[in-house]
């Protein structure tokens, strides 16, 4: 699989940039993930980092070289990333869970699956 990646992140009006961007690939599949911590909420940048790391690590475990069921994979990995963020909040005794938006796209077999 051949591909070119270009990424750009802009801080906007906030004091810190909470964007996290990652991609990983196997011989036959490509995963791209974008997370943007929700400004105004506690630890949004941490939530974005946890989500990106969790999703990319799951892909690296599952893509052999393809993900067996892309829809199921993305559904499960998003739910599990959410639980990882909740676990972080619990472990750190935070008054509320950190928040982030996440978009993931898995490309394989000539098809893109997004969530």
Predicted regions, residues:
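PP2C/PPM-type serine/threonine phosphatase catalytic domain
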Residues: 1-115
């Amino acid at each position: 699989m051949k591909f070119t990646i270009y990424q750009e992140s802009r801080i906007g009006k906030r004091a810190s940039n909470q964007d996290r961007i990652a991609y990983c690939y196997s011989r036959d599949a490509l995963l791209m993930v974008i997370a943007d911590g929700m400004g105004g909420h506690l630890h949004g940048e941490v939530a974005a980092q946890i989500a990106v790391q969790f999703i990319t690590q799951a892909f690296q475990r599952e893509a052999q070289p393809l993900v067996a069921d892309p829809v199921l994979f993305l559904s499960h990995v998003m739910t599990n990333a959410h639980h990882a963020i909740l676990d972080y909040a619990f472990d750190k005794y935070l008054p509320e869970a950190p928040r982030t938006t996440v978009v993931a796209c898995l490309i394989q077999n000539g098809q893109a699956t997004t969530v």
